[in-house]
């Protein structure tokens, strides 16, 4: 069942109310059986269906296993539509397995948030779901809580919105176990509120400070646990304050810090993060200052913990911590103060004790001394108060000794309280930074541990569970009060029930003081002498009599009944934990610390009255009471976080773990409380719109009705719907704005709606199926008509393919472009040679610059070494001074200590006096030594000043030398510029494209000059050297990037050149294809026009027939059924005719085969006669050639005669249509226009394609230009930064006098400056070495590239040799071709010998010569007419060129007018054809004996035809106007054919069209002859309709072709120009040396292409030879 009800509906879409739309099949399968949830030991619950019911026992099939359970142990399963609902309160059956199943489905689909009544459940995903971005946050700010998916942002936005609208404080309570995601959700809430209410324009905004407070809290308050790598070990309540809608401040309160973690942790856990971050930081000076020289394993408080967290860098986190402190205004000194306390705690833990005479003694005083120095307390006093404390006994103070164990406990207690107070101090400091004087509303975020039930629960768990008990009581009270308030506002009858005291007995049992509760008894035992945990447990057992409390004597524990279950608490160490004991003597010592920060840690103890003792439980109760009072003054929002599993895996949920947390969080209880009344609700308008389909009567509801005005009307309609579907009034309530339902009622209504919708859907499906059937039938009819048209077009295409002249044209056309390509190849080779010369010059210049750089780097290294020696010497002196100062400090401390001891006793005075004298002598000696050292220091300072002067002189010398080098380099660069300018002038004369490349190179050179000049000017000071080092590093990266860009551009340019070559070939092929299609379309157009003329003639004949059939109109109406039958018979007759034509084609094929057999026989006879006529070969050669010419002329004259006969046939058909001459002329012009329009459209398409390619190239150019611009901006930024450094240096020179006044401050900062310079020198040397290595690598690469170039030159030479060899082979092949021609002549001689035996043919030829002369005269007339046509076309081309501007203005008007005319003509033709077809069908279905009766019908039809003819004539006039405009468009197209090549192409196209028309005319005559016996007008008009449709389609195709051809011609020049510009830009950015390699590769590619062209030409010549052979065979056959 789970597979059917869960997985199948997982893809359903959400519906109102939270349901998921499921298929009818899934719903039906669910309804067939009674599905339930049965308990399981492994999975908690499994799904199954009831097989059998036996009283109270059910047999359930759980995945094929039959189990038996009582009815009270199983739970009903929710329908599939409620899977993955957003709110658990919407479930039809509320139970543990139902809630668990819904949460599991949502978790598996990445939905970790789910509403549960009025609060939000959040399950830890253990992975990044990318649902917390700024885009997601913005989406939730624009929506209300329940409009989008459940999310923590929705809760935060709801709180923010209510705060602004109601002016009421809000709170968000986030609870859950450790590792459930509380801290992460708290961070998300704070980030969301900071984004929504952040202020702009401030230097450090308050929202940024609030966000940066989190790393500080995590460092000092978070630690790694078994369940969580970043677990918060304290509770916090963050109040974010708002002034209006903007954040103005914040305040943080902390609860229940886990102090025991400071001194001990579990094996797989860590201490607080700050300890590991300090030990792992990179700041060695700081660690030295804190005396931290070890690793975590070297410290007692850390050695038993885990040292590292996977994927966490402690050093990086420490840097982030210090940055956050800086943002919050915590200064450097204050930061070090906090770090000193943390370090002191580590050192306190490392103090070792040993037993001596029954008392403890410190074994490692140095560690204790470090801790005391960090805390600024005296070591002796610390040891005294730790080991030998003074206790007041009566009026006297008695000193006693502590044992080793006691001392360790005191140290651990001191460490815990130090950390606790320090953490409080950190939070107070954060609050001081985030404080605001504005008083406004706030949003509080509570992050506190959730309810905990462990195997062993102690005092900490009681405090946590007590806190959650109070929060749960607060939740119950708030939630149900709010729910009942909604009922009151909606005017629903309701008896108010107070649920606020449900948990009060347990709370009183813990906290109440009268009668005494558990915590009160604990406080009482803490102040009683000799009290233990057993006495505490005995008091509880004796005095507490409550059903919620139970004592376990065996295990020293008691059981307490909480809202989430019974919890057993063990009382081990409760007294010590509640006392939180520590040494008052040590606390007072810390209060007297010399460090202000340390002394402030215990100031709060001074405010406590003497003798007043406050336990941990009392403090916690006070804090919790304050928190609860704070929450009661706010409007709360609840978030419960849940751990899915213990493996930290985001793949599955552990049912047992999740159920346990649901119980602890009180999820089910909360849902049940929210469902006591009417949990399901829906607005009246929404309810009516969704469920009005269930009404029997139609309800007219206008969507534009205002909901507020028509609320009563919606309410009334909703009541009618509920009463009509049979819902009892006890199951719902009609409120003022909403309708409320009991549990499960809305699910039942939804089921009824699904049934109704399924019925309606079935009716709709039936209608759709009927419509689809009709559509399918109509498509079959149209498909049959299309098949007929395709058959006819296919036959015409086959005829064209068999035409020999067309084949010859296709073979010869590619040979015309070979000569152009040779010229282009020569130009490219010249460019390659020029670039090679430029590359050589650039290489020589580069080598000179590299030599200069080497010399400069050597001098710089010497200077740096000298500076480094001086710095080392000064550092040694400073260290010596520090040692002397340290000794003097120690001496002073000893002196002070001695002076104090003098006044302690009279008996030791003499001894101390002698010791004082000794010390005085030592002091004098040390004073003298100090004076001596001071003199040495002064001498060293003098030497240091002298060395500084020397360094200044050395710097000046370096600057002068560098300036000389600059001048030399500039001179070389000027010479280089002059050479470049000369090269530019030469290249400019040859090619403008190369000039642009050289200009780009010149710009790059100027930029390089400026960069070098700026760099050398800034090397005068140490700061300039540092800037130079950084710039060199950045330039190194830029060089690497430019090198990568160059390689990418090189590859890209190569690919583009190859693509251009391929594209060029493709364009040539497309041009040939277009010309072929254009000729084919022209022939088809002519044929269609002729067919149309023929059919119009047939139409005129039909008009006469209609006059004879006038009286049969009424009788025809009764013959409709017969007409259908006759239509079918007509189709059958057409099919029979088609079969007859196919048989005729077969017969022609048979005839062709017989002719081929005869040809073979003749060839065999020719071979036999070859030996006989060999003697007569030379004598008859001339005669045979003459006769061959005669035969060709006869053949040509015969063809011309056929054409003349065809033209005469056309004239006769035109004479028959004298009344429609104008119409025919207009139609001819239309066809011509359509042909040119098609050509125009084709040109437009090609132009678009080429423009698209051009746009791609432009995009590439834009990208490259942007990269160049970026590099220029980087150079400009470097220039500005260096100018600023220069200005700063000038200011520094002006401040030299002030430097003398602050010489002492400079000496104090000398150490830091020396360290910085030393680090800079090391970094500079490393970068310089890297730069040298890069230069060396560049040289090696240049050498390798030169070798590659030499190898390429060798390959070029070899290829040249191969080309010469191929040329020789070609010449040899040409000689073979000449030999073949000779053989061909021999064959022709054989033909002449064969003709001597065909005397009868010669006589026939002589008889036909006179006829041929007549034909030749007619052909000459046709030639004259054709020449006149060509002249006319040329004149039209000239006229159209002049009208180019006018065409551009009226092209759009012409197209719109043409489209209108075409549409009108097409409509009229369709009407005309439809009517003609109808009449023709009626006539053909009648019998000949009824002709007289149909005369009236024919008269009426003739009248209608006359009217139609008049309408058609009017439309033809409109066509003529459109055609005049189209002729202008045609002329504009011809304007682009300026060259002689294009004019010759047009002439050849016209010739091919004329010949094609003649062939089409002959084919038409044959078809007309075959169909002349048919008298079926229906066939005529059917073909007329089909031909008109084909004509329209062909016209549109020709228009598209014409437009595309025009666009292609216009865009060829543009794309060529753009490609050239792109190549110029690319070449300008590529290094000259590597460009030579690229050009060599291009040259090789061109040569390979040339070889390919030569091979193709050779193959074409072979094809020509074969063609002439076949032509000779044809001639032989004719002879």
From Swiss-Prot:
Task: Give the Myosin motor domain ranges.
Answer: 83-754
Q: Which GO terms describe its biological process?
A: actin filament organization
- Key word Repressor present in the record? no
InterPro entries associated with the record: Kinesin_motor_dom_sf, Myosin_head_motor_dom-like, Myosin_N, Myosin_S1_N, P-loop_NTPase
Which residues are in coiled coils? 823-1644
Q: Which GO terms describe its molecular function?
A: actin filament binding; ATP binding; microfilament motor activity
**Domain Myosin N-terminal SH3-like as annotated: residue spans:** 31-79
Which residue stretches does the UniProt record annotate as biased composition, category Polar residues?
Answer: 1-14
Which cellular component terms (GO) are annotated to the entry? Answer: cytoplasm; membrane; myosin complex
Instruction: Give one Pfam hit by family name.
Output: Myosin_head
Annotated spans, Actin-binding: 624-646
Tell me which residues bind ATP: 176-183
Question: Which SUPFAM superfamilies does this chain map to?
Answer: P-loop containing nucleoside triphosphate hydrolases
Look up keyword rRNA-binding and say if it applies. no
Keywords recorded for this protein, A-Z: Actin-binding, ATP-binding, Coiled coil, Motor protein, Myosin, Nucleotide-binding
Segments carrying the region annotation (Disordered) are 1-22
Judging by the UniProt lineage, the source's domain of life is Eukaryota
Q: Which Gene3D superfamilies match?
A: 1.10.10.820, 1.10.287.1490, 1.20.5.4820, 1.20.58.530, Kinesin motor domain, Myosin S1 fragment, N-terminal, Myosin VI head, motor domain, U50 subdomain
UniProt function note: Cellular myosin that appears to play a role in cytokinesis, cell shape, and specialized functions such as secretion and capping.
Q: Which family does it belong to?
A: Belongs to the TRAFAC class myosin-kinesin ATPase superfamily. Myosin family.
* Name of protein: Probable myosin heavy chain ECU04_1000
Q: Which organism is it from?
A: Encephalitozoon cuniculi (strain GB-M1) (Microsporidian parasite)
Taxonomically, what lineage is the organism?
Eukaryota, Fungi, Fungi incertae sedis, Microsporidia, Unikaryonidae
């Amino acid at each position: 069942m789970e597979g059917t009800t869960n997985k199948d509906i997982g893809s359903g879409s959400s519906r109102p109310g939270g349901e998921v739309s499921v298929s009818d099949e899934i719903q039906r399968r669910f309804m067939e059986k009674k599905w339930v949830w049965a308990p399981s030991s492994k999975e908690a619950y499994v799904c199954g269906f009831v097989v059998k019911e036996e009283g109270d026992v059910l047999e359930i099939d759980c995945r094929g296993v039959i189990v038996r359970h009582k009815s009270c142990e199983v739970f009903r399963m929710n329908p599939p539509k409620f899977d993955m609902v957003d709110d658990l309160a919407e479930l039809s059956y509320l139970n543990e397995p139902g809630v668990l199943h819904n949460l599991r489905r949502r978790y598996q689909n990445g939905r970790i948030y789910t509403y549960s009544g009025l609060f939000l459940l959040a399950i830890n995903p253990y992975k990044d779901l990318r649902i917390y971005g700024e885009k997601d946050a913005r989406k939730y700010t624009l929506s209300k809580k329940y409009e989008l998916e459940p999310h923590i942002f929705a809760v935060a936005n709801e709180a923010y919105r209510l705060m602004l609208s109601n002016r009421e404080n809000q709170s968000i309570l986030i609870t859950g176990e450790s590792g459930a995601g509380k801290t992460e959700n708290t961070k998300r809430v704070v980030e969301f509120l900071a984004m929504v209410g952040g202020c702009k324009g401030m230097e450090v905004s308050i929202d940024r400070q609030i966000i940066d407070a989190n790393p500080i809290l995590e460092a000092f308050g978070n630690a790694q646990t078994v369940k969580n790598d970043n677990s918060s070990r304290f509770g916090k309540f963050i109040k974010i304050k708002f002034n209006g809608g903007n954040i103005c401040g914040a305040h943080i309160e902390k609860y229940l810090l886990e102090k025991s973690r400071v001194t001990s942790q579990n094996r797989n856990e860590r201490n607080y993060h700050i300890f590991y971050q300090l030990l792992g930081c990179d700041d060695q000076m700081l660690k030295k200052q804190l005396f931290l020289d070890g690793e975590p394993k070297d410290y007692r408080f850390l050695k038993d913990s885990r040292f590292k967290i996977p994927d966490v860098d402690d050093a990086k986190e420490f840097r982030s911590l210090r940055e956050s402190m800086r943002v919050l205004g915590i200064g450097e000194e204050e930061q070090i103060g906090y770090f000193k306390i943390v370090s002191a705690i580590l050192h306190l833990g490392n103090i070792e004790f040993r037993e001596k005479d029954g008392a403890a003694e410190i074994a490692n005083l140095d560690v204790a001394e470090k801790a005391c120095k960090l805390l600024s307390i005296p070591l002796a006093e610390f040891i005294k108060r730790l080991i030998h404390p003074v206790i007041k006994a009566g009026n006297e103070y008695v000193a006693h000794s502590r044992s080793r164990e006691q001392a360790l406990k005191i140290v651990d207690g001191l460490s815990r309280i130090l950390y606790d107070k320090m953490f409080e101090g950190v939070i107070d400091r954060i609050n001081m930074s985030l404080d605001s004087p504005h008083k406004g509303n706030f949003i509080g975020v509570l992050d506190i541990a959730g309810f905990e039930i462990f195997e062993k629960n102690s005092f900490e768990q009681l405090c946590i569970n007590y806190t959650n008990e109070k929060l749960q009581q607060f939740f119950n009270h708030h939630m149900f009060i709010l729910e009942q308030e909604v009922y009151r506002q909606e005017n629903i009858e309701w008896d108010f029930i107070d649920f606020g005291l449900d948990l009060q007995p347990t709370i009183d049992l813990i906290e109440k003081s009268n009668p005494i509760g558990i915590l009160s008894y604990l406080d009482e035992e803490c102040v009683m002498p000799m009290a233990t945990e057993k006495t505490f447990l005995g008091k509880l057992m004796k005095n507490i009599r409550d059903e919620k409390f139970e004592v376990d004597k065996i295990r020293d524990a008691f059981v307490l009944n909480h809202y989430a279950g019974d919890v057993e608490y063990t009382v081990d160490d409760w007294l010590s934990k509640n006392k939180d004991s520590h040494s008052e003597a040590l606390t007072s010592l810390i209060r007297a610390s010399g460090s202000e920060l340390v002394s402030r840690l215990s100031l709060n103890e001074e405010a406590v009255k003497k003798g007043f003792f406050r336990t941990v439980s009392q403090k916690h109760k006070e804090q919790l009471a304050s928190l609860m009072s704070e929450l009661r003054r706010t409007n709360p929002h609840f978030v419960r976080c849940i751990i899915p599993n213990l493996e930290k895996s985001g793949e599955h949920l552990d049912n047992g773990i999740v159920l346990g947390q649901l119980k602890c969080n009180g999820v089910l209880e909360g849902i049940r409380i929210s469902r006591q009344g009417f949990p399901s609700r829906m607005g009246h308008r929404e309810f009516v719109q969704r469920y009005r389909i269930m009404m029997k009567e139609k309800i007219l509801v206008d969507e534009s009705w205002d909901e507020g005005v028509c609320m009563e009307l919606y309410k009334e309609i909703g009541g009618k719907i509920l009463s009509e579907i049979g819902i009892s009034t006890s199951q719902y309530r009609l409120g003022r704005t909403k309708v409320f339902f009991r549990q499960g009622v809305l699910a039942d209504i939804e089921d009824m709606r699904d049934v109704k919708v399924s019925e309606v859907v079935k009716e709709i499906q039936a209608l759709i199926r009927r419509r689809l059937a009709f559509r399918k039938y109509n498509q079959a009819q149209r498909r049959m008509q299309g098949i007929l048209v395709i058959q006819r077009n296919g036959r015409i295409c086959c005829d064209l393919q068999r035409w020999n002249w067309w084949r010859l044209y296709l073979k010869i056309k590619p040979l015309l472009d070979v000569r152009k390509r040779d010229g282009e190849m020569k130009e490219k080779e010249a460019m390659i040679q020029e670039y090679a010369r430029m590359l050589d010059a650039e290489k020589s210049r580069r080598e000179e610059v590299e030599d200069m750089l080497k010399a400069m780097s050597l001098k710089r290294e010497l200077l740096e070494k000298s500076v480094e020696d001086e710095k080392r010497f000064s550092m040694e002196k400073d260290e010596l001074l520090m040692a002397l100062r340290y000794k003097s400090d120690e001496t002073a401390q000893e002196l002070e200590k001695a002076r104090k001891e003098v006044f302690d006793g009279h008996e030791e005075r003499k001894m101390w006096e002698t010791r004082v004298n000794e010390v005085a002598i030592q002091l004098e000696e040390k004073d003298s030594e100090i004076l001596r050292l001071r003199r040495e220091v002064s001498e060293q300072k003098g030497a240091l000043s002298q060395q500084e002067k020397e360094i200044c002189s050395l710097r000046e010398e370096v600057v002068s030398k560098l300036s000389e080098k600059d001048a030399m380099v500039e001179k070389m660069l000027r010479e280089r510029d002059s050479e470049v300018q000369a090269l530019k002038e030469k290249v400019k004369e040859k090619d403008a494209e190369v000039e642009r490349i050289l200009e780009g190179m010149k710009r790059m050179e100027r930029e390089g000059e400026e960069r070098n000049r700026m760099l050398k000017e800034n090397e005068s000071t140490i700061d300039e050297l540092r800037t130079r080092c950084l710039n060199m590093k950045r330039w190194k990266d830029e060089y690497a990037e430019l090198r990568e860009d160059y390689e990418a551009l090189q590859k890209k340019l190569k690919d583009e050149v190859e693509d251009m070559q391929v594209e060029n070939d493709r364009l040539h092929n497309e041009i040939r294809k277009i010309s072929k299609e254009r000729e084919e379309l022209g022939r088809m157009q002519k044929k269609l026009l002729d067919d149309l003329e023929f059919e119009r003639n047939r139409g005129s004949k039909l008009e006469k027939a209609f006059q004879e059939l006038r009286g049969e109109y009424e009788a025809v109406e009764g013959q409709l059924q017969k007409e259908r039958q006759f239509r079918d018979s007509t189709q059958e007759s057409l099919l029979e005719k088609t079969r007859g034509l196919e048989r005729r084609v077969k017969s022609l094929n048979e005839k062709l085969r017989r002719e081929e057999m005869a040809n073979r026989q003749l060839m065999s006879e020719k071979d036999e006669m070859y030996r006989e006529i060999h003697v007569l070969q030379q004598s008859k050669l001339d005669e045979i050639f003459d006769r061959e010419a005669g035969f060709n002329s006869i053949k040509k004259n015969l063809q011309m005669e056929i054409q003349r006969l065809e033209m005469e046939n056309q004239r006769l058909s035109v004479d028959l249509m004298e009344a429609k001459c104008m119409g025919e002329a207009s139609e001819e012009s239309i066809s011509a226009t359509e042909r040119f329009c098609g050509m125009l459209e084709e040109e437009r398409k090609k132009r678009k394609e080429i423009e698209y390619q051009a746009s791609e190239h432009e995009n590439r150019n834009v990208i490259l230009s942007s990269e160049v611009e970026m590099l220029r901006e980087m150079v400009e930024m470097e220039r500005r930064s260096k100018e600023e450094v220069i200005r700063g240096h000038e200011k520094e020179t002006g401040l030299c006098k002030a430097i003398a006044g602050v010489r002492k401050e400079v000496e104090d900062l000398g150490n830091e400056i020396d360290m910085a310079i030393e680090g800079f020198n090391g970094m500079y040397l490393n970068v310089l070495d890297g730069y040298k290595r890069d230069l060396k690598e560049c040289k090696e690469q240049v050498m390798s590239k030169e070798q590659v170039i030499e190898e390429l030159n060798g390959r070029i030479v070899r290829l040249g040799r191969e080309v010469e060899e191929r040329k020789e082979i070609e010449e040899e092949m040409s000689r073979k071709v000449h030999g073949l021609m000779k053989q061909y002549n021999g064959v022709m001689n054989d033909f002449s010998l064969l003709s001597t035996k065909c005397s009868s043919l010669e006589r026939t030829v002589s008889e036909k010569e006179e006829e041929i002369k007549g034909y030749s005269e007619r052909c000459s007339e046709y030639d004259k007419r054709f020449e006149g046509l060509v002249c006319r076309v040329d004149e039209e081309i000239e006229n159209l060129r002049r009208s180019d501007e006018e065409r551009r203005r009226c092209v759009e008007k012409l197209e719109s007018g043409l489209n209108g005319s075409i549409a009108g003509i097409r409509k009229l033709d369709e009407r005309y054809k439809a009517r003609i077809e109808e009449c023709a069908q009626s006539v053909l279905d009648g019998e000949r004996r009824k002709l007289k009766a149909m005369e009236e019908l024919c008269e009426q039809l003739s009248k209608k035809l006359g009217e139609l003819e008049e309408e058609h004539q009017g439309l033809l006039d409109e066509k003529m106007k459109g055609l005049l405009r189209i002729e202008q468009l045609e002329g504009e197209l011809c304007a682009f054919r300026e060259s002689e090549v294009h004019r010759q192409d047009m002439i050849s196209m016209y010739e091919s069209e004329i010949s094609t028309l003649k062939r089409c005319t002959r084919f038409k005559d044959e078809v007309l002859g075959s169909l002349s016996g048919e008298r079926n007008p229906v066939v005529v008009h059917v073909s007329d309709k089909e031909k008109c449709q084909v004509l329209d389609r062909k016209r549109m195709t020709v228009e598209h072709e014409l437009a595309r051809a025009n666009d292609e011609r216009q865009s060829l020049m543009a794309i060529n120009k753009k490609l050239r510009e792109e190549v110029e830009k690319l070449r300008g950015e590529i290094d000259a040396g590597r460009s030579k390699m690229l050009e060599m590769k291009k040259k090789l590619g061109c040569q390979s292409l040339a070889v390919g062209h030569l091979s193709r030409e050779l193959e074409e010549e072979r094809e020509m030879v074969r063609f002439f052979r076949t032509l000779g065979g044809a001639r032989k056959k004719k002879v």
